[in-house]
Design a protein with these regions (language model features):
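Short, surface-exposed connector motifs at secondary-structure boundaries
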Residues: 13-17, 124-129, 151-154
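Glycine-rich phosphate-binding/hydrolytic loop that grips phosphoryl groups
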Residues: 145, 156-190
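Gly/Thr-rich phosphate-binding beta-strand-loop-beta motif of the actin/hexokinase/Hsp70
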Residues: 1-16, 141
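Glycine-rich phosphate-binding loops at beta-strand->alpha-helix junctions
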Residues: 62, 123-147
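Active-site phosphate-binding and catalytic loops of NTP-dependent enzymes
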Residues: 43-47, 63, 116-123, 179-183
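Phosphate/ATP-binding catalytic cores across multiple sugar-kinase/actin-like superfamilies
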Residues: 99-126, 172-175
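Phosphate-binding glycine-rich/basic clefts of nucleotide- and phosphate-handling proteins
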Residues: 11-101
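Residue-level signature of catalytic and energy-coupling elements of molecular machines
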Residues: 33, 111, 133, 169
Length: 190
């Protein structure tokens, strides 16, 4: 789950079997948070503040009955849309969850659709290996649990998920054992 897109792929024997890229990413979540804070609290916030809210309050399986007291409010600063003056407001976790729930539904639906298009011969490998989540927004609380619940598959998360793609590219480029995974566009003769 990258900044602007989410890539869902089934990989086997070092190659992509089926793949889908959807235009949903962390930046879209940030914008959804900006929009709901403006709509519900009459406060304009910037994308950095929205990202802070995302990292602190976002939960793919939010259950307000199971939350500790005080964990469900984050105080943020912005500009009041009515007065135009700086303002502080407590943003609730349940408001953020309701605003971004559709994002997670779209991701899980896309994963299930891709798995339905996957050759049945790969089912054993998929069940054994599971799903791997990478990218900055893949570390949102309970996203792995939601995907596991929706797909009935094991979901693996990676350490430092936001840097995993660039670290992988670095390994592919620097280690000759992985050269076959590198894509090099052919020069055109224009």
């Amino acid at each position: 789950i990258g900044a602007d897109t989410t890539e869902i792929s089934v990989i086997s024997l070092g190659g992509i079997v089926v793949s889908r890229i959807i235009k949903l990413g962390g930046n879209r979540l940030d914008q959804m948070i900006c929009d709901v804070v403006k709509r519900k609290y009459n406060i304009l916030i910037g994308l950095k503040t929205a990202e802070q809210i995302k990292k602190t309050l976002s939960d793919a399986m939010y259950d307000e009955d199971n939350e500790e007291e005080g964990d469900d409010i984050l105080y943020v600063y912005g500009r009041n849309v009515i007065t135009g003056l700086p303002s502080e407001r407590g943003v609730s976790k349940d408001t953020i969850y309701e605003a971004i729930k559709q994002f997670f539904d779209d991701i899980t639906d896309s994963i299930k659709n891709l798995l339905e298009r996957t050759p049945p011969e790969l089912s054993a490998d998929i069940i054994d290996t599971g799903i791997f989540l990478t990218g900055g927004s893949s570390s949102i609380k309970n996203l792995d649990k939601l995907i596991a619940k929706e797909t009935d598959l094991k979901v693996n998360t990676v350490e430092n998920a936001e840097d995993s793609v660039i670290r992988g590219i670095s390994i592919i480029m620097s280690d000759s054992r992985y050269r076959k995974l590198m894509y090099e566009p052919r020069e055109s003769s224009f």
